[in-house]
Amino acid sequence: EDSIELLISQLDNNDQDIYNTIVESLLAIARVNPINENKQNQIADEINTIAEKVYTLNECLNMLPDDEHKFLMEDYLNNEIQNTLPTLLKLGVLDVPETPIETYIHTIKSGDPSKLPFLLEFFENVFSKNEREVINPLIEQLPLDERSKIGNLHFKSMPTNFNQKLIESVYSPNKWESAIALDYLLF
């Protein structure tokens, strides 16, 4: 119980790699000793926080101007989504830790559209209704503008100005994000 409390207290989405490691640790602990219900509200808050982060990344991709300078920024945003989405799914199964989520993540990453209905049905039985409404569109193969509408429906603080988001990113504690944003602004 103390380990779970300590790990949850260390969750900080400014460093996604550390965040991912902490969620991996929480999942490993939950598979041995289920996380009690009073921690589930904290985990639900984390699910919303990380889902909002993924929708924000998608929104930035959607707002990214289609020009010759977009390659590095687009690659960074896609990489961040691919790095963050599995952690969101792992957070979502902490209350049912025996779920073979790693297999499902691998299936999602493979991009096989024939397996998508199976995955969505599985998540139908694992995630709460609210979690499904937020998480499933991130798994489905949707156009960016449709995913953008869903993000704006669920989260009121979605970015609306790409240049403003770039300026914020320059001052990010994530040095890679800061460098890429600065590089993009200079060109």
Segments (PLM) and residue ranges:
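Alpha-solenoid repeat junctions
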Residues: E1, L26, A30-P34, G92, ...
